Amino acid sequence: MSALLSADDLNDFISPGIACIKPTVTENRSQEASEYGEVEIQIDENGKPLEISKIDGATKNLSPAQISLADCLACSGCITSAEEILVAQHSHNELIKALKEKKTNNKIFVASISHQARASLATAYYMKVSDIDRLLVDLLVNQMGFTYVVGTGLGRKLSLINESQSVIERKEHGFQGPILSSICPGWVLYAEKTHPHVLSRISDTKSPQQITGCLLKSLTAHQLEVERDQIYHLSIMPCFDKKLESARPEQDPSLVSNDVDCVLTPKELVTLLDECKDKFSLTFDALSHSSGSLTDLYQSCAPANWPYVELSWSSDSGSSSGGYGYNYLQLLQSHLCLRDPQQYQPQNFRLESVAGRNKDIYELRLVYNDNQVASSAIVNGFRNIQNLVRKLKPTSSTTTTKTNPLVARRKARLSSKRSESGAQDVQQADASKCDYVEIMACPNGCINGGGQINSPTDEDQKLWVSKTLTRYGSIPMVDLSSDSSLTLELMAWCREFCINYNVPESRLLKTWFHEVEQPTDQAAILVGSKW
């Protein structure tokens, strides 16, 4: 694997198969075959395959088989994506290539930057997030020639609102058991390929990356009076799996181009700067020459028709993965108070936190007058995800569950010790019994994504992540729950956007999932199942 992306960089990484099992698609060329007649394949002096007609000796170059990111999404040969595909189609080299071709194809370059990536870069360069924002705008706009740069805060808030509304609606219609978030593409791919029984539980709300991409391309195209496919959107994200998310096919093909053309991580951005020192740099001179407020800076690099500019660079309460579990409960509280103000008063609500078996799983409970109203859980890391999925697996009523005798004896021993000491059972988080679960594949969540910059060799990685988390927490917060009018404003603007720019709401806000069928060819199974 490359120096940028390796198994060591990805927590709980499950190695892909040793070879791709995707079958080669043979095109139907009956008319050409009748002209060529019988053919044979030969290799020329340059090692390239040729198709040679036995009738007249005419030759034709053969196209090599290619694997795309979309192919990876539709294949069950690997649980995670092939690294070569990620590097080939979403890499800093591809961005450099696209920038070089800008003069001939007149592409318009725009970028969006996630909160976690900003925090990671600020930690790596030992500066404040506000300063790294200034340097990133200078790099992208002044040095690379990008037309617009925005934060993903607006897309995230629309995602949070849509997610919460969706969960509330499904629960009010009697949905039983937990609804699972879909913001983490690594977790979603894992579910599609190995645990299809949970797909009906997964929310169909799009991530901030994809919502931001749809907004940015549509607004830019309208303002500059160009087609969407003339716009090249770079998204800077904390995770390599975000590259795969950008390649997911849309259910609604009305918008012709992908919402995101290239995803780079902070690691890859630093590599680009190292390899192109003569052209690009996060130059500290830009700070000394940067007068004016951050608000002015954010306004200057956003499309003129981009709403809530400062909001796009603001953060949200809750976890460093976006706060989906926390915001669901806060927005549910607001919903209950608005729906039935006689029964629910805001001052009588409180939020309780319950720890799990480890620091990567915990539960939040919304309590009203000592009665639990709803709950959400935060589950990070594949080990915790696997435990949750196992609990959610349907069991046949005709089969009896066998208890491991060792486990039974251990439970009895612990119970006996508690009885002898007079200690009470301590509550422990159980995500399988919550209303909603925020799931992220990486331990510690997105702040510790596989694409985030690692600690220097002389510094502890856990301490480094803690420093990154501190910088993430320094980003100004605008809570949806603290201002109910903001939520209503955003919902109204979203509806107007969809009408004015002819974008279906489902195209902007919704995604879809499907079971990836296992291969039936025995040779493919043999090759693709070696882990």
UniProtKB/Swiss-Prot annotation:
SUPFAM superfamilies: Fe-only hydrogenase. It comes from the Eukaryota. The keyword RNA-binding does not apply. One of its GO terms (biological process) is iron-sulfur cluster assembly. [4Fe-4S] cluster 2 binds at C184, C239, C442, C446. InterPro entries: Cytosolic_Fe-S_CAF (IPR050340), Fe_hydrogenase (IPR009016), Fe_hydrogenase_lsu_C (IPR004108). The keyword Iron applies. One of its GO terms (cellular component) is membrane. Residues 395-426 are annotated as: Disordered. [4Fe-4S] cluster 1 binds at C20, C72, C75, C78. GO terms for molecular function: 4 iron, 4 sulfur cluster binding; iron-sulfur cluster binding; metal ion binding. Keywords: 4Fe-4S, Iron, Iron-sulfur, Metal-binding. PANTHER family: NITRATE, FORMATE, IRON DEHYDROGENASE. Component of the cytosolic Fe/S protein assembly machinery. Required for maturation of extramitochondrial Fe/S proteins. May play a role in the transfer of pre-assembled Fe/S clusters to target apoproteins. Belongs to the NARF family. This is Cytosolic Fe-S cluster assembly factor NAR1.
